[in-house]
Regions:
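Active-site hotspot residues in diverse enzymes, especially metal/ion-binding acidic/histidine motifs
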Residues: 1-217
Length: 217
């Protein structure tokens, strides 16, 4: 499948699925999936039309995952900005991961990272890469940032010589259980940001000292 993909368009072509975008007024509500109890009725996905096209595309993937894989767990799923105590955190995490993998597959993202790896040695370099990938896959910057963080172990393997087919995809819990600890590109972005901020402050301090010395002389 060519990328970027329009999940809303795909959902609109699925028989037995009704998709609508409406202005949802509840705070933080991004979408709703209503699963039919009877095969004669359509499943329904409602998206918040107050959100932009990229956000709705991701939300649609999230709700579609509920429709496809979580029928056993209930009839209605609300996609909220922050998961509430009454929601199943694991199912919401699964739906987010499913939408992210559908829109930004790791087998397409990892080669892009390796190709640009030499430019990812500064805060701005990583920021530029995130922006470039968000345009390539038609997602928000935050989706790419989360992918870079979640796929840190997979990225480590690939840039160090593993083939795409040999890359092991492990959850954070499995990595911790196996004693695997990797630094993500998002961790490095924060490191570079602080380093560059400190460097800027140092130069500013020296500049101020020079101005004071000139004034005294």
């Amino acid at each position: 499948k060519s990328y970027p993909i329009n999940i809303k368009k795909i959902c609109g072509e699925i028989e037995g699925l009704t998709l609508e975008s409406i202005p949802l007024k509840s705070k933080g509500l991004r979408g709703i999936a209503v699963l039919s109890k009877d095969k004669s009725d359509d499943d329904i996905i409602l998206l918040n039309s107050n959100r932009d096209a990229c956000e709705q595309n991701f939300d649609c993937g999230h709700e579609l995952y509920h429709v496809a894989f979580h029928r056993y767990a209930g009839n209605t799923f609300n996609c909220l900005e922050n998961v509430k105590p009454c929601q199943n955190k694991f199912l919401e995490w699964q739906a987010n991961e499913g939408s992210a993998e559908l829109l930004v597959p790791y087998k397409l993202l990892l080669p892009e990272i390796k190709k640009s790896y030499c430019t990812l040695k500064s805060y701005q370099g990583i920021q530029n890469f995130i922006y470039k990938m968000s345009k390539k896959f038609n997602v928000t910057d935050s989706v790419i940032s989360i992918r870079l963080d979640d796929l840190k172990y997979e990225i480590f393997q690939y840039v160090n010589g593993a083939s795409l087919n040999d890359v092991k995809v492990l959850s954070d819990k499995r990595q911790k259980d196996d004693g695997i600890y990797c630094i993500s590109l998002i961790d490095m972005r924060e490191f570079y940001r602080k380093k560059e901020e400190k460097k800027h402050k140092f130069h500013y301090y020296n500049s101020c000292k020079a101005d004071i010395n000139i004034y005294r002389s």
